[in-house]
Amino acid sequence: MTDAPQHPQQPATGTPATPKAAPRVGRDVRIGATCGLLVALMVGAAYAAVPFYNWFCRATGFNGTTQVAKVAPSAAPLARTVAVRFDSNISGGLPWKFEPEQTEINVRIGEVATVYYTVTNHAATATTGQAAYNVTPLTVGSYFTKINCFCFTEQTLAPGEKREMAVVFYVDPSFAADSENDGVRTITLSYTFFPVKDAAPKPVAASEPDRPGGSI
């Protein structure tokens, strides 16, 4: 019996078979999950950086951030004096007038001083502002200490209200021991009021109490 003639194998024609998609889909899912995790970590780090930055500035006086204390220093004031100038600014969108009652005073290092700012709301409605602050030279930030300040809280003013606000502060005696401050003769305390757009409804705060007698 004669075998059937063998024909040469013809090359395959048409579109090759599509490989299975499951492995690629799984890889895409893993990549997407990894990217999502990285984004979440970056967002979380950004939010965590804000309170850390604020704490760092308060702890070190970085960028002219002042310190906060509840009581006056226990040591007696030094003989050395320094001039403290007072600056005031209003951010756009806040219809207030804001200015210091004194533009400059001289204080002894370690002496507690009280100064006053006045603010007037020119709007026809109650408005709320929050004051940001710093001191220059920036090296002074870790020594300039506030005991009381209107900048600690938001300020809500009734239409047309004028308010007197106090700042109680001292320059820490350790300021004089820092060689970086040997040439510092003047410190500038600067405030800028910014509008608070989403302030919670609350009664308009009472005016500052009458100032105590005596000079600064």
From Swiss-Prot:
Side Periplasmic, residues: 50-216
Major site of localization recorded for this protein: membrane
UniProt key word Isomerase: no
Segments crossing the lipid bilayer: 27-49
Source domain of life: Bacteria
Alphabetical list of SUPFAM superfamilies matching this protein: Ctag/Cox11
Subcellular location as annotated: Cell inner membrane
Compositional bias ranges of the Low complexity kind: 1-23
Single GO MF annotation: copper ion binding
UniProt keyword Transmembrane present: yes
Key words of the record: Cell inner membrane, Cell membrane, Copper, Membrane, Signal-anchor, Transmembrane, Transmembrane helix
Cytoplasmic side: 1-26
GO annotation, cellular component aspect: plasma membrane
GO biological process terms, semicolon-separated: respiratory chain complex IV assembly
Cross-referenced PANTHER family: CYTOCHROME C OXIDASE ASSEMBLY PROTEIN COX11, MITOCHONDRIAL-RELATED, CYTOCHROME C OXIDASE ASSEMBLY PROTEIN COX11-RELATED
Family: Belongs to the COX11/CtaG family.
Summary of the function given for this chain in its UniProt record: Exerts its effect at some terminal stage of cytochrome c oxidase synthesis, probably by being involved in the insertion of the copper B into subunit I.
Name under which the protein is recorded: Cytochrome c oxidase assembly protein CtaG
Lineage: Bacteria, Pseudomonadati, Pseudomonadota, Alphaproteobacteria, Hyphomicrobiales
